[in-house]
Every structure is written in structure tokens, then in C-alpha cells.
């Protein structure tokens, strides 16, 4: 719930379902620690128990994500094979890739597939597997097996959280898929907006020093920037885009 809190009656009206159904579903979410029910109001709780859905994430830090994409596109060369993960940050790249054609794009993300399937000069390799609706992507053993048979010039990804200068996600399936892409790519690029340094998740993927480039947005704190550079991270600060950052 993007509003943070909502009356239970509003949920029933919005989705045209019974109050009994709403209460049953909210009870399950409350049991999982994702919200609190009190006096007819459901309130979302901050949580690292699950990955957020792409529908929610796509609207979060949209300006910063576009800033990161504009910086990342300069690291792609025509003729390359490029892995793209299922993050909403990397999805900002899809509208920019035509300028780098011809390219081969390999992805497990349904939204990226839909964006690029008719773009001239883009050869698209779609990875199948078990479909996960919350992130609009395919993951699982079938997906990682297919990835292991491929080799790419570049892998571009984002992450749910950065703790102790390590990328973290809350889903083991996400970790397995991204690590497989990471391992078969010659160059690895991480896109991370400033909010990722304030979040936590369960499963570690890679240290930031393992990436060839870590791109952060202009609102990243000077303390984070200085610390990362002091550790030898190949850090790029995306320039502020006029008209995008308030």
C-alpha cells in the first residue's frame, strides 16, 4: 500500500471484494509481519522479510534510477552481449539501448522482454523458468542452467540493499539468478541509488569491490562515497540530470 495506511473498507471497495476476504488476507499479512491491523485501519510496516513487488518499486526513486541509467549507457558498446537483471532500476535502460544497437540483450525480466521485443537492432534472448509475479521475472534451476551455457560482455544489475558494502537481496532465487549472470559476464556493473545504503536484506550476493563499476546517484552521501573509494571500489557518481532531481 503506497499510502502507508488505509481503511479496511476502502480495500473492499477498491477491489470489489467482501470484508471477510479482506480481513482474512490482512490477517495473513499481519502474521507475516508486513502490516498492522487496528480499529479498521491497515498500516504497512517497514520490513526486510520479503522483496517488494516491481509494481511498488518502479515508482520509487524514479529520478535517481533514470540518472543511473544515463550513466550506465555510456559503458555499453555496439555489438556486445549484455545481461540485464529484473530490477526496476535496470529497466530504465530499455529506452536507451537502441542508440547502442546492434546489441544482444539477455534477460529473465518479462517487462524488459516486452519493451525490447520490437526494437530494431536488438537481438533478444529471453530466459525461461519458474515465473514470479511479484518481480515479473523467471527464476529457478531452469533459468540458472540456461545462464550457465552463455557468456556475456556485460552484466548490469541493481540490488535491494547494501550492508557492509555487500549487495543483499531477500530472495534466495534472486541471488541464485543474479550470481549466475555475474559469474558468466566479463564486466559487471552495479547501479545503486542512495537509498540502498540505508536498507537491509538477508542473502549476500557480492562485495562492491567485485564489480568493475559501481554507479551511484548524486544524492549518495559523501561519507558513503569516500568509504567506497577508500576500499578500492571502482565508483562512478552519475551527474545530476537537469529537471529531474528536485
List the predicted regions and their residue ranges:
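Conserved phosphate- and dinucleotide-binding cores of soluble alpha/beta proteins
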Residues: 2-10, 16, 31, 111-246
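HTH-adjacent hinge/linker in prokaryotic transcriptional regulators
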Residues: 1-83, 87-88, 94-102, 106, ...
Amino acid at each position: 500500500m503506497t499510502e502507508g495506511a488505509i481503511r479496511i473498507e476502502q480495500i473492499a471497495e477498491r477491489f470489489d471484494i467482501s470484508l471477510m476476504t479482506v480481513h482474512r488476507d490482512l490477517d495473513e499479512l499481519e502474521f507475516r509481519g508486513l502490516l498492522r491491523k487496528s480499529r479498521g485501519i491497515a498500516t504497512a510496516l517497514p520490513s526486510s522479510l520479503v522483496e517488494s513487488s516491481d509494481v511498488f518499486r518502479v515508482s520509487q526513486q524514479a529520478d535517481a534510477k533514470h540518472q543511473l541509467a544515463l550513466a550506465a549507457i555510456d559503458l555499453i558498446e555496439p555489438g556486445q552481449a549484455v545481461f540485464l537483471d529484473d530490477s526496476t532500476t535496470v529497466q530504465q535502460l530499455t529506452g536507451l539501448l537502441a542508440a547502442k544497437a546492434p546489441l544482444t540483450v539477455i534477460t529473465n525480466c518479462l517487462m524488459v522482454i516486452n519493451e525490447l521485443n520490437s526494437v530494431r537492432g536488438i537481438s533478444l534472448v529471453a530466459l525461461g523458468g519458474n515465473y514470479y509475479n511479484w518481480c515479473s521475472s523467471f527464476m529457478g534451476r531452469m533459468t540458472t542452467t540456461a545462464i550457465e551455457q552463455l557468456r556475456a560482455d556485460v552484466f548490469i544489475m541493481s540490488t535491494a540493499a547494501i550492508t557492509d558494502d555487500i549487495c543483499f537481496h531477500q530472495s534466495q532465487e534472486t541471488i541464485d539468478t543474479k550470481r549466475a549472470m555475474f559469474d558468466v559476464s566479463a564486466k559487471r556493473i552495479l547501479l545503486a541509488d542512495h537509498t540502498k545504503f540505508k536498507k537491509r536484506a538477508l542473502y549476500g550476493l557480492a562485495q562492491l569491490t567485485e564489480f568493475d563499476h559501481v554507479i551511484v546517484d548524486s544524492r549518495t552521501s559523501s561519507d558513503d562515497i569516500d568509504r567506497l573509494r577508500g576500499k578500492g571500489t571502482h565508483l562512478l557518481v552519475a551527474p545530476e540530470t537537469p529537471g529531474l532531481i528536485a
